[in-house]
Amino acid sequence: MRPEKRSFSIQGHRTSISIERAFWLALKQAAAEDDTTLADLISSIDKARGEAGLSSAVRVWLLKRLQERAAQVTANTK
């Protein structure tokens, strides 16, 4: 799996993110579920990332989202 690079404008400046296709698909799905644009979702991740690189922050954000959803499903089945 090779990372795919895409560019966005975030807070008035252009930036690029290189993540694997599976992460792009998950990110697009998350944006659709949250009724927001991909650029706005990436911007919100960017604002909360601290010193981590943006690509890493996106991957970690997606992992945390998946873990939270799995925990909700587990809690609802008990």
Please name every model-derived segment.
Residues E4-R6, A75-N76:
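Non-transmembrane, interaction-prone segments in cytosolic or luminal domains
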Residues K5, S9-L62:
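Amphipathic, hydrophobic secondary-structure cores in small proteins
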Residues R65:
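Short, basic alpha-helical nucleic acid-contact segments in DNA-binding proteins
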Residues E68-K78:
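Short, charged, intrinsically disordered terminal tails
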